[in-house]
């Protein structure tokens, strides 16, 4: 009985150290990238020794790969896009086939896109994807395409409810993304713009106004 308890305690301790290492590594890699992050710095932040890190991970490459590919997981989407009913429960605007709903969809998109973590993640992916190709693939699949898929589902839902037979939701989503990003994303990415709630709302309002006009002008 004591032996079993001892093994359980040891396993819990190992798991706790693993979590501490992963969390510290995530912070350092998002801030400094692969080359800029040091194992000494990660160990210090995790409260462990460098030797302990190497008992959990074979090398820096393995640690980076595991941590950053995990960071490329959108927990809202899991593996697949949820059905419309689930999206409607998660986002009140998904039920609205209105310009206001479109604006709220844009605001949600921008809140995610312009969050500090997502901007940092994109910088790391563009910097290190050549060394870690799977990182780029996972980012494209789980982050970029995932959020676009929500917009496609929403715009398809609007077209269905409005009986807009000629609308192509995929093309409309690409256009709306471009309007939302215009004059904002690049500036935020390079630290020239702080994406506060007011700036996000202003951008979403402007983009949705233009997009709604386009949708209703040639609605089919």
Model-assigned labels for residue ranges:
Residues 22, 65, 99, 103, ...:
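An amphipathic alpha-helix signature
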């Amino acid at each position: 009985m004591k032996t079993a308890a001892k093994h359980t305690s040891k396993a819990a301790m190992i798991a706790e150290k693993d979590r501490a290492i992963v969390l510290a590594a995530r912070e350092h890699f998002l801030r400094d990238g692969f080359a800029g992050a040091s194992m000494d710095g990660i160990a210090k932040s995790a409260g462990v020794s460098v030797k302990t890190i190497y008992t959990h991970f074979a090398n820096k490459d393995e640690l980076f790969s595991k941590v950053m590919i995990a960071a490329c997981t959108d927990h809202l989407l899991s593996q697949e896009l949820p059905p419309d009913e689930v999206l409607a429960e998660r986002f009140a605007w998904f039920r609205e086939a209105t310009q206001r709903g479109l604006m709220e969809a844009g605001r949600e998109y921008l809140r995610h896109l312009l969050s500090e973590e997502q901007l940092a993640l994109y910088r790391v992916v563009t910097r290190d994807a050549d060394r870690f190709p799977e990182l780029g693939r996972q980012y494209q699949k789980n982050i970029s395409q995932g959020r676009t898929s929500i917009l496609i589902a929403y715009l398809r839902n609007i077209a269905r409810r409005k009986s807009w037979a000629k609308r192509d939701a995929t093309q409309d989503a690409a256009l709306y993304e471009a309007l939302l990003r215009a004059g904002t994303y690049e500036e935020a990415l390079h630290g020239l713009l702080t994406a506060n709630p007011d700036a996000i709302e202003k951008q979403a309002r402007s983009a949705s106004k233009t997009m709604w006009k386009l949708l209703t002008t040639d609605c089919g």
